[in-house]
Amino acid sequence: MKKRCSGILMPVSSLPGGYGIGSMGQAARDFVDFLVLAGQSVWQILPVGPTSYGDSPYQSCSAFAGNPYFIDLDQLAADGLLKPEDYAKENWGTNPNYCDYALLYQKRYKVLRKAYAAFLQQRPVPGYDTPYSDDWY
């Protein structure tokens, strides 16, 4: 006999977020905790690949990459790659019930480039800067 389960379909983009769209950050962890408390065992999400023209999650340019819109900016700040003032002062839109993808694209990539530049300035972590294929030679 199969075990039954229940859950919800909700895209990551629908999570609450102060930066134009929901992310895989604290709001996602809080939502999973809520699902557990509600006795749910499944959270079905829409595809999370990067989108292109039209911003449809079903029209991704990659089967493997993740959508940079879902990167948690607060976590990047906690990791020392951003300062809160790098993104908190940006205009992420005026309606919390609507995602302005054109504005999001313009603002999010600007902030993510700052985080990437900070990442490049960090010292390498021992063991992570070694090619994975060394053992295969």
Predicted segments with their positions:
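Acidic/aromatic-lined carbohydrate-recognition and catalytic surfaces
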Residues: 2-137
